[in-house]
A protein has these predicted regions:
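Juxtamembrane/interface motifs at transmembrane-helix termini
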Residues: 39-43, 51-53, 92-93, 180-181
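Surface-exposed alpha-helical segments enriched in charged/polar residues
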Residues: 49-50, 111
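Acyl-donor (CoA/ACP) binding surface of acyl/acetyltransferases
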Residues: 1-27, 60, 64-184
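Conserved GNAT-fold acetyl-CoA-binding loop/helix
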Residues: 28-49
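Short loop/turn motifs at secondary-structure junctions and domain boundaries
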Residues: 51-56, 142
C-alpha cells in the first residue's frame, strides 16, 4: 500500500472487484482521452481470480481518497525495453479532475517503481490535447520527448501521442533537492 496525504494507491481487494468493474466499464465517465473499449465483467473477474491484476508484464492499483472511496486506477506495464515501464491512469469521476489525485498517485507509483525495482526509465503517453495529463507529467518531473505521429486508435480515430519520460537520475536528483530543503 502506498499512502500519500491526498490518496492511497493499493492493490485491489476481493471486496473491490464488483465496484471496480462497474466504475471501469462506465463508458460516459471515460471522457475524450481514455479508450472506449471495455472488457466483459466475467473476463475481469477471471483475471482478478487468476492474477489479482498483477503479473510480470503489468500491475494494476486502485486509487482511493481519504474516505476510502475508489476514485481511480493506475497501472504500469512493459514498454519497449526491459529497463522501461509505461504508466497509465484514470479517474472514475470526471468531476474529481484537477484536484491533484492523479498527480499524487503518479508520484507514489514513481517512488515505488524506482525504489523497489531496477527500472531506469518511466514513460507517459497521451493524446496531444490532454492538458490534464500533460500537467501531471510536468508536475511529476517528466520531460517531453516528442510526438509519435498517428500512434494509436482512440474513440474512433487515429491519433498522435505525446511521449514524456522520467529517468532514474532525474528522479533521484529531484528527491535530493526536496529532502535537503531547510525546515520552516
Amino acid at each position: 500500500m502506498l499512502r500519500g496525504r491526498l490518496c492511497t494507491v493499493r492493490h485491489m481487494l476481493n471486496t473491490d472487484v464488483n465496484a471496480y468493474i462497474a466504475l471501469t466499464n462506465d463508458l460516459p465517465s471515460r471522457g475524450d482521452y481514455y479508450s472506449s473499449q471495455f472488457t466483459s465483467p466475467e473476463l475481469l473477474r477471471k483475471e482478478f481470480i487468476q492474477t489479482a491484476f498483477v503479473s510480470e508484464d503489468k500491475e494494476l492499483f486502485v486509487i482511493e481518497d481519504a474516505a476510502h472511496n475508489l476514485i481511480g486506477s493506475i497501472h504500469h506495464f512493459k514498454s519497449r525495453t526491459p529497463l522501461c515501464r509505461e504508466i497509465g491512469y484514470r479517474l472514475f469521476d470526471p468531476a474529481l479532475a484537477g484536484r491533484g489525485y492523479i498527480t499524487a498517485a503518479t508520484g507514489l507509483l514513481i517512488d515505488y517503481l524506482f525504489g523497489a525495482y531496477q527500472y531506469h526509465r518511466l514513460e507517459l503517453m497521451m493524446e496531444p490535447n490532454n492538458v490534464g495529463s500533460e500537467r501531471v507529467a510536468l508536475k511529476c518531473g517528466f520531460t517531453f520527448e516528442g510526438t509519435l505521429r498517428q500512434a494509436f486508435f482512440l474513440n474512433g480515430a487515429i491519433r498522435d501521442a505525446r511521449l514524456y519520460s522520467l529517468l532514474r537520475p532525474e528522479w533521484a536528483a529531484a528527491r535530493a533537492v526536496v529532502t535537503n530543503l531547510p525546515e520552516l
